């Protein structure tokens, strides 16, 4: 399965709930600094991602200013991880040997204290995918990037208190599409972020005060470190018309994770995507030209423009 564009809608909808983050907030300074650092240092982020969208993932990482490495063999992944600033695992398309290989890779990344982003594409569908995602609970990522249904499914799979309304069995992604809105995934996202932070505090040699993050893509994206919930209105409806928008966002999040803390990385990547989508909307005439314009916008949008984007505290 591929992570299709509709798992990252990013459509401007007039979402207004929440308190605006002040213009002089340190959060905005951190975001601008992350965007600049990526462009100045071109950090390497390794991706283990779906065959369907691998090209867009790599090109988006390059357009954002980073360096891309795409790996599939476990030994390649581990060796490359030693020199990469961060890593990205996407479970969109699977082969039988991944059932053992991916959990082993996750364990090695954590042993090496290498930050990594998980995109749990189509969480809850298929025994192999479910087994892999369940195994990740014991070797969790530093950040999760997903749509609302995937976040809810993963939190339920890990037995976390998600505060999900209704029968949890009803909250399943329709393939790689989200059948839940972002708001309904708030409890699951917070629970996941708290769990990731607790686990990494126990086992990582990094600063124990650093919190992990979860980014939920949708009409008004949600990003949380388990303590504060941010909403990010904006983007373009055309993002739903190109496959790989969500997958590539995960890759770019890993690029930012190579130079910043998880919350800053998640906010920076999501805001960059919203801004680039809005810019591409003004010059494109359909999905093909939008994708080209979008990559150009990832390259041209300034750090100041990203940091000045609308950010609301829920």
Swiss-Prot record:
The keyword tRNA processing is assigned to this record: no
Entry cofactors: Mg(2+)
Organism superkingdom: Bacteria
Keyword RNA-binding tagged: no
Source organism per UniProt: Bifidobacterium longum (strain DJO10A)
Its job: Catalyzes the phosphorylation of the hydroxyl group of 4-methyl-5-beta-hydroxyethylthiazole (THZ).
Class of the enzyme per the UniProt entry, highest EC level: transferase
EC numbers: 2.7.1.50
Pfam families in the cross-refs: HK (PF02110)
Name of the molecule in the record: Hydroxyethylthiazole kinase
Recorded metabolic or biological pathway in which this protein acts: Cofactor biosynthesis; thiamine diphosphate biosynthesis; 4-methyl-5-(2-phosphoethyl)-thiazole from 5-(2-hydroxyethyl)-4-methylthiazole: step 1/1
InterPro entries xref list: Hyethyz_kinase, Ribokinase-like
Sequence positions that bind ATP: 145, 217
Binding site for substrate: 70, 244
